Curated annotation (Swiss-Prot):
Coiled coil: none annotated. Keywords: Chondrogenesis, Developmental protein, Differentiation, Disulfide bond, Gamma-carboxyglutamic acid, Osteogenesis, Phosphoprotein, Secreted, Signal. This is Matrix Gla protein. Residues 1-19 form the signal peptide. GO terms for biological process: cartilage development; cell differentiation; negative regulation of bone mineralization; ossification. The modification Phosphoserine is found at residues 22, 25-26, 28. Its main location: secreted. It is found in: Secreted.
Length: 118
């Protein structure tokens, strides 16, 4: 029993010495999750698939990048802003984007029909 306790104490001391953090690398201090805007910054897109294999010398990275439609880009912008996202659940992304990001100024109110002079 006494030798078992000595072995456990020695094992704990060795574990503490081996697990000492040297501060040479701060990888353990990095965030586990990255923001959505940076999610694809370190991942390269697939070079091809069974339906469109890469041709030539493989320098077609820019040709195979998908170009997002303006509607998809607006929807992603709206998803990042929570009030716009909640409004979009009820009214759709197009209306939500127009409401929150549509124009820099508020639309001018038209004068009444009686006030118009032709």
């Amino acid at each position: 029993m006494r030798s078992l306790l000595q072995f456990l104490a020695l094992s704990a001391a060795i574990a503490l010495c081996v697990c000492y953090e040297s501060h040479e690398s701060s990888e353990s201090a990095e965030d586990l999750f990255v923001p959505p805007q940076q999610a694809n910054s370190f991942m390269t897109p697939q070079r091809g698939n069974a339906y469109s294999p890469p041709r030539g010398n493989g320098n077609n990275f820019n040709l195979m990048r998908t170009v997002k439609s303006p509607a998809e880009r607006r929807a992603e912008t709206c998803e990042d802003y929570s009030p716009c996202r909640f409004y979009a659940y009820r009214h759709g992304f197009q209306q939500a984007y127009q409401r929150y990001f549509g124009s820099g100024t508020h639309p001018q109110q038209r004068p009444a029909a009686a006030a118009r002079r032709y």
